[in-house]
């Protein structure tokens, strides 16, 4: 249905890479269809933990070492993921600022600025951010995104690309019913 939604907010997991999400908007099927024909990618937002960003940025840990990997084959390091997320963001939410010391905040700001001098940095607690800082900003720039070294690999590697949903067994569903959803019963069912 046309004009059914004003905005669609896609929230990826903390260990996902933003570039493949953006590249999906640029990809065209064999029939010439593209997600960008029906939706506009407006803003890429990354949330960074002000307390732990310096530790993560200087870490040699693999994501799987912290129990957060997308599977046994996930060979990414914390710093690789952090760098890609910050480099590709239009807005970086520097979160947990009340928990961070002045030195931690200053180090976090410097890391973000070094990796992405054009990003809007929004300082927050509990990721409480004014909507106007992340919605309808017009900040996403496809031309700038296409300059990223991984853009062409992601976009033109789609022929051999296995979607993350298949690769990691991720699925979703939409629950619609006239009866009220009861989370307690659902949790009991899952157990």
Question: Which sequence ranges carry the predicted segments?
Answer:
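Nucleotide-state-sensitive switch-loop elements of NTP-binding domains
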Residues: 1-80
